[in-house]
Swiss-Prot record:
Annotated residues for binding of Zn(2+): C220, C289, C296, C299
Catalytic activity, EC: 2.7.7.6
Pfam families per record: RNA_pol_Rpb1_4, RNA_pol_Rpb1_5
UniProtKB keywords: Chloroplast, DNA-directed RNA polymerase, Metal-binding, Nucleotidyltransferase, Plastid, Transcription, Transferase, Zinc
Protein encoded by which gene: rpoC2
Protein name, entry field: DNA-directed RNA polymerase subunit beta''
Enzyme class: transferase
GO cellular component, as recorded: chloroplast; DNA-directed RNA polymerase complex; mitochondrion
Record-level GO BP terms: DNA-templated transcription
Species assigned in the record: Oenothera glazioviana (Large-flowered evening primrose)
Length: 1383
């Protein structure tokens, strides 16, 4: 063997590729016989070595890539940032999904590329590495899943699951990852079963198309070819394309010819081409062969089995069909290979070569603003853009190709390796794209608004589907909704209040005069804060099952109140103001708990003698069980306690019996309730000491006498402390259960009287079979004062009797006389509770029932906020039955809106359907298209927040930390413009604020110069044209104060900020989250400006949805959308996943030219483009003909590249010639136009391309035809042989049509001859039967002028074509129409 040849395989690893090269070299040098002998020796050597060296594979051989951790972390950071931008409304859902998939795909791919170098460096002889990279079993993708990450998966429908599997199979999957992994694996299993049959069927159809193609002649004489350039494809593919082909033209270097026409190309010639960098090489191809039904040797090239030109009679068609079909069978058998793992393509990036300032021509004709596929702002280049980067000493020039996105601004400083441009991969027609609809659903209910003009789609003129002309935001303004199908008059008026947990009831009234109120029963259920259920039957009212709902607010520490009394001195009649403080603020200020709790009814309405608050005095608390006694049995008068009546949710005080005692006694004892099965370790009536074990897990806390009683629920074990006396005479002891001896009744100076100075409790014990004895138990005495000093708790002004609103104090002993009290799990027991009862004098002038109304008022003093509870006497329309159905009256909506007292006796049998509402809210009217069904919108409290700088708060003796800047503080249920609990009759009085002029921070907080201000605020909803809504009275929105955000502006630059804010913020404006309103930082939530005041802005929270042009909006402006409704639909192009299980369907789609694929769309555009520009380029005469011709050439190249791309991605090598033969057949038909050659062909008749050209030349008239793509199935049914067609499909139809038309079958193909049993006209020995006639030899081979002209036009003006094609087809240069490649 030659020495040069020997060095090629010297000291190299022989893998699969090297073996192929070795065999081809051996065949070239030694021929087939010697090569087979050498290969036998190689095989024997291999088997011997494999037997001697075995390989074992263990789980420890799977080495995880070290860089995986930070790569995954980086991808998670990008995903998190993406989620934020989506929340802010900067990117929409499709862009977010697309970028998320590409981030994880890039991470997975990078890990896969890192895998091989990692193995080579750390463990080159790793069995996994050897196995997969030698080609024995497995491949990079499978090993990547074992040691890298499993990556993104497809679901059974082929859609992408955007949650990646970050683990690999070596680490193990989590539960979620396992379920997602099963999706893809299931898809792989199903595909394997289904597609195996498809592969066989594909082979059959392919063979059917090309079975008649046989090598029949040596040279067809064509002058055409396709040009291949080494610059436009990778070197490996360039070599594969050229080897075995035949040159269509001479190759010159300068004036020297190095290769001649019709010379076949070997490896040596290819190496010379590469080394000399010869530009476009024209090669012959089956596309340009002039044989109609056959193919010539030179257009086919070398035989794949041995290196010579193919012999005459070779059935190259069947070889081509099997070459493409057989790997398809292999592909389906390898579907489990990745198990549904997604593979796709990402855009190419242009990076800066060095640091410097970037400059380019910022011209609107060259670049214009756009959005990238991921929603980032960028500049779109419409043509080639020259970019210069100026560093310190070097100028770098770059050219950005057209249709690319420039990601930097002009004159911006860029760093080295920074991405400055993105070459969009989506412009190529070779990618598999599909148009997908993506629906975006609302995740909350609310009102729909949009910030741009929209227009109706033509097909949806009368519906609620709109198209967006430009990028804009859609807004869902928060608020609940409630539809009422009831009577046209509504209980709710615009700006009315709604109370917490209030229910909207849909009611139908059936007129019946017979029923009266006593026969109607109601049940009201509302959520409770305290979970107690009370059933109370009040006289004159039907039964109500209610759950008491109370709000507890604790009063501020009394000493501050006394100092603060100036604040409350000037007050109007019929009003009571009490400062309150929430428990959270009290904890922050470290103020001790005063124990006063205000108890507000749900609807904020107090009746007369309602309980306003209660006070638990810590002096009357005990931690032990015991008995309360008011006096001794013989000494105290009969006293009954007063009762509390629950009346419509208000604790009302009814003084039925007045307390007359001034003290009471508490006899402590220790009680243990034990289960019946427990073993007791002490006996009845025995004496024990402290900490004695009385049961298995129980010890006594005190010593004394033990009493054991068996009860229904278990064993009661009581321990009485005290002293035991054995009296001499039993009869003197009273037989009562016990006698209380108050202090001071015994002998003054005796030891016992000193010992029992608090009084004693005498109890007689009678044990069985033993002597009687008496137990003296200690007593705790509690003195009850004549009532708490009101001045100690409230400012003096509150205690004035002259006003008609009063506070009364009543002490209430919680437990009855002689009743045992049991402690519960170490909690203290309150024995006495002090009630504060609200009372007022009845106004004689008004006969209607008055009620007191509670509301919260807020005073802001230099950032320090104080809340006050204000109680006003009002005439409540809810308590007045006459005003119930008065449409002009508006008021509070309480829990019991449809109480029976308010139902007219003429209406009865109400049927109610309840829908509980969340929070205190305000009703708003809503514009509704449907007049029949009014709807309510309730703006609920959970969406409201306010922001403000709370700082510079300094006060002594009150430790208060400055609240952090921009803290979010929830607004109380009843504060502010939407929450004051006044009835809204006068619009002016609705907004009630207390403001201040000056604040002095001295020892205690004092507010001077108080004045009350009334503000009528701007408070309307705007429509898109800026006009104020004219609300429809039949539909309502209910706003809730918590849906609003309060934004307080800084006080230090008060005047400036007011001027600034008036220019920045306008009423009805939408503000995105993270945008800046004022100088003190970004705004925290998105929404619509609802109220603008001097020092604050109230914003109704809203959710933005970004929508791009062409998106479809569902719903009308101002319409209520519910949770889960479709907001917008995007139409976008998506790359189909390049999963191996989809390889075969792709090949089939291309070959069948299915309409779902994008080929037909692209071809249509290309034909149009060529028809527009061909006249300008080529001149008029041949324009249309050459346009159709080039369209066919372009479509053929495109098809070959698509099919090759699929197979090469799976590592399957198929020579282009095989695919070209198939593609030649499916593109060899043209469609006659309506106006063309009516005397020869019928309009819209399918004829062969060569036949059309020859007929046109023979008749010397122009032919009008269109390029037409047939799929392989239709091609099989459009052949010259009806026997072949009938044996494939639709036998009866084909034979019937052939009989009617009188078709002749010339039996030229293989299949026809097999069917009728004739000799097959194929085989290398068949050439002896084919004789050339003398007439054929005598014909001079003149080259026609037409061919010469076509050759001249097509191939001597290549530069002109290249520029035209690249501009009109929008292909990257690698994908020009004369190139065979897969890039």
């Amino acid at each position: 063997m030659d020495e040069g040849v020997n060095l090629v395989f010297h000291k190299k690893v022989i893998d699969g590729t090297a073996i192929k090269r070795l065999i081809s070299r051996l065949i070239d040098h030694f021929g087939m016989a010697h090569t087979s002998h050498i290969l036998d020796q190689v095989k024997t050597l291999g088997f011997q070595q494999a037997t001697a060296t075995s390989i074992s594979l263990g789980i420890d051989d799977l080495l995880t890539i070290p860089s995986k951790g930070w790569l995954v972390q980086d991808a998670e950071q990008q995903s998190l940032s993406l989620e934020k931008h989506h929340h802010y409304g900067n990117v929409h859902a499709v862009e977010k999904l697309r970028q998320s998939i590409e981030v994880w795909y890039a991470t997975s791919e990078y890990l896969r590329q890192e895998m091989n170098p990692n193995f080579r460096m750390t463990d080159p002889f790793n069995p996994v590495h050897i196995m997969s990279f030698s080609g024995a079993r497995g491949n990079a993708s499978q090993v990547h899943q074992l040691v890298g990450m499993r990556g993104l998966m497809s679901d059974p429908q082929g859609q992408m699951i955007d949650l990646p599997i970050q683990s690999n199979l070596r680490e193990g999957l989590s539960l979620t990852e396992y379920i997602i992994s099963c999706y893809g694996a299931r898809k792989g299993v199903v595909d394997t079963a289904v597609r195996t049959s498809d592969a066989g069927y594909l082979t059959r159809r392919l063979v059917e198309v090309v079975q008649h193609i046989v090598v029949r002649r040596t040279d067809c004489g064509t002058l055409r070819g396709i040009s291949v350039s080494p610059r436009r494809m990778p070197e490996r593919i360039f070599i594969q394309t050229l080897i075995g082909r035949v040159l269509a033209d001479d190759i010159y270097i300068g004036s020297r010819c190095i290769a001649i026409r019709n010379q076949d190309i070997g490896i040596g010639l290819v190496n010379r081409f590469i080394s000399f960098r010869i530009q476009p090489i024209s090669i012959r191809t089956p596309f340009t062969c002039r044989s109609t039904s056959w193919i010539c040797r030179l257009c086919y090239g070398r035989s794949p089995t041995h290196g010579d030109l193919v012999e005459l009679g070779e059935a190259v068609g069947i070889i081509a069909g099997q070459s493409i079909g057989e790997p398809g069978t292999q592909l389906t058998l390898r579907t489990f290979h990745t198990g549904g793992v997604f593979t796709g393509g990402t855009a190419e990036h242009v990076r800066a070569p060095s640091n410097g300032k970037i400059k380019f021509n910022f011209n609107e004709a060259l670049v214009h603003p756009a959005r990238t596929r991921h929603g980032h702002p960028a500049l779109l280049c419409s043509m080639d853009l020259d970019v210069t980067i100026e560093s310190e000493d070097i100028l770098h020039n770059l050219t950005i190709p057209p249709k690319s996105f420039l990601l930097v601004q002009n004159n911006q400083y860029v760093e080295s390796e920074q991405v400055i441009a993105e070459i969009c991969a989506g412009t190529s027609t070779f990618h598999f794209k599909e148009r997908v609809r993506k629906h975006i659903y609302s995740d909350s209910e609310g009102e729909m608004h949009w910030s741009t003009d929209v227009y109706h789609a033509p097909e949806f003129t009368y519906s609620n589907v709109h198209l967006l002309p430009k990028t804009s935001h859609l807004w869902i303004l928060s608020g609940g909704s409630c539809r009422s199908r009831g009577a046209p008059f509504s209980l709710h008026k615009d700006q009315d209040q709604m109370n917490p947990r209030s229910t909207e009831r849909e009611r139908r009234y059936l007129s019946s005069l017979s029923a009266n109120n006593d026969q109607i029963r109601y049940k009201f259920f509302s959520s409770s804060f305290s979970g107690k259920k009370k059933d109370d039957r009040s006289p004159g009212y039907s039964e109500m099952n209610r759950i008491i709902c109370t709000l507890h607010c604790n009063l501020i520490y009394p000493s501050i109140l006394r100092e603060n009394s100036d604040l409350l001195a000037k007050r109007r009649r019929n009003r009571l103001v009490i400062p309150v403080q929430s428990s959270q603020e009290r904890e922050k200020e470290l103020i001790p708990h005063s124990g006063i709790s205000i108890e507000l009814p749900i609807n904020g309405i107090f009746r007369k003698k309602s309980i306003l608050a209660f006070f638990d005095d810590p002096r009357y608390r005990t931690k032990s069980s015991g008995i309360t006694q008011y006096e001794t049995m013989g000494m105290h008068s009969i006293v009954k306690k007063e009762g509390l009546v629950d009346y419509r949710g208000i604790n009302e005080f009814k003084p039925k019996y007045q307390m007359t005692i001034d003290r009471f006694f508490f006899i402590p004892e220790e009680v243990h309730i034990l289960p019946e099965s427990s073993s007791i370790m002490v006996r009845n009536n025995s004496l024990i000491g402290v900490d004695t074990r009385i049961a298995l897990n129980t010890r006594s806390r005190a010593g004394g006498l033990v009493r054991v009683e068996r009860k229904k629920r278990g064993i009661a074990l009581q321990i009485f402390s005290g002293t035991i006396h054995f009296p001499g005479e039993t009869d003197k002891i009273s037989w009562d259960s016990g006698i209380l001896i108050p202090p001071g009744t015994g002998k003054r100076n005796s030891k016992e009287s000193k010992k029992w100075k608090n009084g004693i409790y005498v109890q007689r014990i009678t044990p069985t079979k033993k002597k009687h004895f008496v137990l003296f138990r200690p007593v705790v005495t509690y003195e009850i004062a004549d009532g708490l000093n009101l001045a100690r708790l409230f400012p003096p002004d509150l205690c004035q009797e002259k006003d008609n609103m009063q506070l009364q104090i009543v002490n209430y002993i919680v437990y009855g006389n002689g009743k045992p009290i049991r402690e519960i799990s170490d909690t203290s027991i309150q024995l006495v509770r002090t009630w504060f009862i609200l009372n007022w004098d009845q106004d004689k002038k008004s006969a209607s029932a008055e009620a007191a109304h509670a509301s919260f008022v807020e005073v802001r003093a230099k950032g320090l906020i104080r809340d006050f509870l204000r109680i006003d006497l009002v005439k409540s329309p809810i308590l007045d039955p006459r005003k119930r159905n008065d449409p002009s009256g508006s008021g509070l909506i309480s829990d019991n809106v449809s109480d029976h007292t308010n139902i007219n006796p003429f209406y009865s049998k109400p049927k109610m359907k309840q829908s509980p509402r969340q929070n205190h809210g305000t009703i708003r009217t809503l514009l509704n298209q449907n007049k029949e069904c009014p709807s309510l919108m309730i703006l609920s409290a959970s969406n409201c927040f306010r922001m403000g700088p709370f700082n510079d708060v300094k006060s002594q003796n009150v430790i208060k930390e400055s609240i952090k800047k921009d803290a979010i503080i929830q607004i109380r249920n009843s504060i502010g413009p939407l929450g004051t609990a006044l009835q809204v009759v006068n619009f002016d009085s609705f907004y009630y604020f207390i403001t201040h002029n000056q604040v002095l921070l001295t020892k205690y907080l004092q507010v001077e110069n108080l004045k009350q201000t009334f503000q009528v605020l701007q408070y309307y909803l705007m429509d898109e044209s800026g006009r104020i809504y004219n609300p429809d009275p039949r539909s309502n929105i209910v706003l809730n104060s918590f849906n609003l955000s309060w934004y307080f502006l800084p006080h230090n630059n008060y005047e400036n900020s007011c001027e600034e804010i008036s220019t920045i913020v306008s009423l009805g404006q939408f503000i995105c989250e993270n945008g800046c309103i004022a100088k003190n930082g970004p705004y925290l939530r998105s929404g619509q400006v609802l109220i603008v005041q001097l020092d604050s802005v109230v914003i109704r929270s809203a959710k933005p949805y970004l929508a791009t042009p062409g998106a479809t909006v569902h719903g009308h402006y101002g319409e209520i959308l519910y949770d889960g409704d479709t907001v917008v639909t995007f139409l976008y192009e998506k790359s189909r996943s390049g999963d191996i299980t989809q390889g075969l369907p792709k090949v089939e789609q291309v070959l069948e030219v299915r309409s779902v694929d994008s080929i037909s769309v692209n071809l249509e555009k290309r034909v149009e483009n060529w028809n527009e520009h061909i006249t300008r380029i080529l001149g008029f005469p041949w324009g249309f003909l050459i346009g159709a011709e080039l369209t066919i050439v372009q479509s053929r190249i495109s098809l070959v590249n698509k099919i090759q791309k699929v197979y090469r991605s799976q590592g399957v090598q198929i020579h282009n010639r095989h695919i070209e033969i198939i593609v030649r057949q499916i593109t060899s038909k043209v469609l006659v136009s309506e106006d063309g050659m009516s005397n020869v062909f019928l309009p819209r008749e399918l004829i062969g391309l060569l036949r059309a050209e020859r007929t046109g030349r023979a008749l010397e008239e122009s032919i009008c035809y269109k390029a037409f793509l047939l799929g392989i199935t239709r091609t099989s049914l459009n052949t010259q042989s009806f026997i072949s067609e009938a044996s494939f499909q639709e036998t009866a139809r084909v034979l019937a049509k052939a009989a009617l038309r009188g078709r002749i079958d010339w039996l030229k193909g293989l299949k026809e001859n097999v069917v009728i049993g004739g000799m097959i006209p194929v085989g290398t020995g068949f050439k002896g039967l084919v004789h050339c006639s003398k007439q054929h030899k005598s014909i001079p081979k003149n080259k026609h002028f037409f061919e010469g002209e076509i050759r001249d036009i097509l191939f001597h003006h290549r530069e002109l074509f290249d520029s035209c094609i690249s501009k009109n087809f929008h292909d990257t240069p690698e994908q020009s129409f004369r190139v065979f490649n897969d890039s």
